[in-house]
């Protein structure tokens, strides 16, 4: 037996049934749809339609709203930053900025900024330049001998700042 001769066992796969291909197939003529009526026609399915009964999405009350002023921040835990320093992905002597976190692979891309959270151990002396930081994160960084500076630049201004340009907000 060779790799190019490997096949599925007999009966392991089943061919797709093609409907409407002659009465001898057993699924010809009406193609398994019964006779006439709304459900026999094409394009019958209207999403959420319940035959005239008030549909579920209209029976339930509206709730909440989308805040257009909300800041979409990346959350970064101190434990992940320490792991990146240990792995050599982050330079302990350079300030930890949004750009540095993206290059280290800790965050995929900069959204509206970064919030530093105090989960995990931090032993390296680091200086952070982030959008926000929790109290526990600030305490842990200062205990390790580092510092935290918070700056905020929204949207396009933030992207410009992360590319080396000066943010004017």
From Swiss-Prot:
InterPro entries reported in the protein's UniProt record: Ribosomal_uL15, Ribosomal_uL15/eL18, Ribosomal_uL15/eL18_sf, Ribosomal_uL15_bac-type, Ribosomal_uL15_CS
Source domain of life: Bacteria
PROSITE patterns found in the cross-reference section: RIBOSOMAL_L15
UniProt cross-references to Pfam families, sorted A to Z: Ribosomal_L27A (PF00828)
Start and end residues of each stretch annotated as Disordered: 1-40
Ribonucleoprotein recorded as keyword: yes
rRNA-binding recorded as keyword: yes
Keyword list, A-Z: Ribonucleoprotein, Ribosomal protein, RNA-binding, rRNA-binding
GO CC terms, sorted: cytosolic large ribosomal subunit
Biased composition range(s): Basic and acidic residues: 1-13
Gly residues compositional bias, start-end: 21-35
A single MF term (Gene Ontology): structural constituent of ribosome
GO biological process: translation
TM region positions: none
Assembly and oligomerization: Part of the 50S ribosomal subunit.
Family: Belongs to the universal ribosomal protein uL15 family.
Function: Binds to the 23S rRNA.
HAMAP family named among the record's database cross-references: Ribosomal_uL15 (MF_01341)
Name assigned to this protein: Large ribosomal subunit protein uL15
